[in-house]
Amino acid sequence: MVLKWVMSTKYVEAGELKEGSYVVIDGEPCRVVEIEKSKTGKHGSAKARIVAVGVFDGGKRTLSLPVDAQVEVPIIEKFTAQILSVSGDVIQLMDMRDYKTIEVPMKYVEEEAKGRLAPGAEVEVWQILDRYKIIRVK
């Protein structure tokens, strides 16, 4: 029996996050677009308000918590793949590292890359929490 590691994340303190970094909110990987830190009072601990946008769904999410609280950060694996076929709303890719076949829905393709998808082209793919996103055509 082969066990597969599904969630590839690590934990960091909320105060260490910066704009442009990534965080998992409600099970969805998100890119931090705004972070605000404020000290509540003389005896209160500092709080962080994090605004992030979902990598896959584009949804805006807000998270408020103490700066010393642990937050889940996704480990993003970046690799090159070759397009085997583009059929309807699914792109079939071949991972150039181990030559396995991957299917990526068209909704997980960056807008600027959509017009340049053609069989044989090489693309940069990000694997985040066991899902794939095509970032750009090389």
Curated annotation (Swiss-Prot):
Entries under PROSITE patterns matching the protein: IF5A_HYPUSINE
GO biological process, one term: positive regulation of translational elongation
Compartments in which it is found: Cytoplasm
Pfam families (UniProt xref): eIF-5a, IF5A-like_N
GO CC, one annotated term: cytoplasm
Modified residues (Hypusine): K42
Keywords, in A-Z order: Cytoplasm, Hypusine, Initiation factor, Protein biosynthesis
GO MF annotations in UniProt: ribosome binding; RNA binding; translation elongation factor activity; translation initiation factor activity
UniProt xrefs under HAMAP family: eIF_5A
Family: Belongs to the eIF-5A family.
Function, as annotated: Functions by promoting the formation of the first peptide bond.
Protein name: Translation initiation factor 5A
UniProt organism field: Pyrobaculum aerophilum (strain ATCC 51768 / DSM 7523 / JCM 9630 / CIP 104966 / NBRC 100827 / IM2)
